[in-house]
Amino acid sequence: MATLIFLSILFPIFTAESASNYDTPVEYEIVLLSEHYHDNEAFTQGLEMHNGSIYESTGLYGSSSLREVDPWSGQVIRSVSLNETIFSEGITVYNDTIIMLTWKSEVAYVFDIKNLTIVSSFSYQGEGWGICYDGKYLIMSNGTSSISIRDPNSFNVLRVVTVTDELGNRINKINELECVTTEEGPRVLANIWQDDRIILFDPSNGSLLGDFDASSISEKNSNGINNVLNGIAHHNSSEFWITGKNWSSMYLVSMTNISGVEEGNCFTGCGQNNNPTSIAIIPVLLMTITFSLPFLFMYRKTRDVKNQQIDETNNRHDELLDAVPASQKRGGD
């Protein structure tokens, strides 16, 4: 009887705790704040905000450029065109320079941000897609699920991580990147090529932290198979500028739960349980155990007497079952 009372008290408590931990989804939403003009001839490859201006790289052979843009009016403040053999890709600001990747040239160009002239370059192997700077390292994508962490001074690869979802599946076609500094550590927002979504992942281990549906914004600009969502620039706090290839608009949006990360909230794969319900049930558990102990001892004594009368051959030992062991196409980014 005491055991039944004990379980009847514990069951609803643990059920409520389990529901609060696992059944309540974390919302990731893109909220449109304002819409602004964007040059629809710009095949956007990279987007970065610095000192109030948007820096944008545009791609395609013969049309690649680096430009400074007023985000509110969309007007180009200054621009530099690149050699027709260069297909520009993602960019990031590092100190007083802008680092620009190229698609297949295996060269990253370094521009002086003051006059947009090339001052140096780095070589790398494979394709270049997106890049961002997290305050310590350069983080670079190549259109697969692999992300390289690089030294900003030498461009050498320090390590490579694979971006995966909560089931361990690789997330491919990772494109333009935007690094975000949070209290939990560096985080990266990424466009997925030809997909209306932006993901948030941890660059230290590649784990997916958030998935944002941007289809409502992409639908406003669905005028070609290559005119896809591409370009994320951090404005402030949870606000970001986003646009796409040959889009006629750029959007200031709020991305929910980005600020939540900054407040130290835990999204997935948390090592500690900080649910206040766990703390609240401790006094109840102690009271229940104290109340149940006398009855449990009385039951144990009665059971031992009865067991002495049972033939030893009738003893049954529950067997534990053996544990079962857990067993890119691209046509011009």
Regions found by a protein language model. Give the residues of each.
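Short loop/turn segments that connect beta-strands within beta-propeller blades
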Residues: 70-74, 112-116, 152-155, 202-206, ...
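Conserved beta-strand positions in repeat-built beta-propeller and related beta-rich domains
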Residues: 55-61, 93, 98-105, 138-145, ...
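Signature of short aromatic-glycine-proline-rich micro-motifs recurring in repeat-based ectodomains
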Residues: 44, 174-176, 225-233
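Surface loop/turn motifs at the tips and blade-to-blade linkers of beta-strand repeat domains
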Residues: 35-40, 80-84, 120-125, 161-171, ...
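Beta-strand-rich domains and repeat architectures in extracellular enzymes and scaffolds
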Residues: 33-65, 80-81, 85-92
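Secretory targeting signatures
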Residues: 1-20, 177, 268-333
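A short helix->beta-strand "capping" segment at the edge of beta-propeller domains
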Residues: 22-40, 72-75
